[in-house]
Amino acid sequence: KCCKKGGPRKCPPEGMTXFYERIFRI
């Protein structure tokens, strides 16, 4: 799930995926 769709290379912390999706638009 890391780097998917050209998103950030870092993996979001557990339970923070959605949070990262909103910020980085993964």
UniProtKB/Swiss-Prot annotation:
Q: Where in the cell is it found?
A: Secreted
Q: What is its main location?
A: secreted
* GO biological process, alphabetically ordered: defense response to bacterium
Got a GO cellular component term for this one?
Answer: extracellular region
Task: Print the keywords alphabetically.
Answer: Antibiotic, Antimicrobial, Glycoprotein, Secreted
Answer yes or no on keyword Secreted. Answer: yes
Q: In which tissues is it expressed?
A: Produced by the opercular gland in the gill cavity and secreted as part of the mucus cocoon.
UniProt's post-translational modification comment states: Glycosylated.
Function as written in the Swiss-Prot or TrEMBL entry: Exhibits antibacterial activity. May play a role in protection against parasite settlement.
List the protein's name: Mucus envelope protein
**What is the native source organism of this protein?**
Scarus vetula
